[in-house]
């Protein structure tokens, strides 16, 4: 199943709507039963919470949206039940927030989970659009622009990170 975000980004609204309807049809029984729907890809997860309800305008899409959360939100919400590692490392972590995470103020839960549960010393990399999300960074016509955008702030910050630092970014896009 697909949330339809990739089609929507390309202006293919009818195809996006069809994919969103298929996904909502599959997820609605779970949402109705109180099951939390956890997404690992910020663009898709947040499409379920924002674009899909607007695109479909149905109670089912709204129910799925209300049940959907990011992995970091799930972990942060269930924090009291999670054991804190006895030997939590104070390893430095450079966190790159996905544009959709930034737009919905959802970098904070990822930062909190890394800091409070994993014991990491987290620094959020301050960036504008990295130019690499979705299909943009892969496109023949947009690849060079994508690289220039990444070089504006993200890639220099990654290169400047200490050797022992972990670089963390949610999702696959």
State each model region's role.
Residues 1-173:
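Iron-sulfur cluster-binding electron-transfer modules in prokaryotic oxidoreductases
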């Amino acid at each position: 199943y697909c949330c339809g975000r990739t089609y929507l980004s390309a202006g293919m609204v009818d195809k996006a709507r069809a994919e969103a309807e298929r996904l909502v049809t599959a997820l609605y029984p779970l949402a109705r039963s109180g099951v939390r729907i956890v997404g690992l890809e910020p663009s898709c997860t947040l499409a379920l919470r924002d674009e899909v309800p607007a695109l479909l305008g149905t109670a089912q899409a709204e129910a799925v949206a209300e049940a959907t959360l990011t992995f970091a939100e799930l972990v942060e919400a269930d924090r009291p039940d999670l054991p804190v590692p006895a030997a939590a490392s104070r390893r430095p972590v450079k966190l790159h927030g996905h544009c959709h995470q930034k737009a919905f103020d959802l970098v904070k839960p990822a930062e909190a989970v890394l800091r409070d549960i994993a014991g990491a010393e987290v620094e959020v990399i301050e960036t504008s659009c990295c130019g690499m999300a979705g299909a943009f960074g892969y496109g023949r016509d947009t690849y060079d622009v994508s690289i220039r955008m990444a070089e504006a702030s993200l890639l220099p910050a990654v290169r400047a990170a200490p050797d022992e630092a972990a670089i963390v970014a949610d999702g696959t896009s």
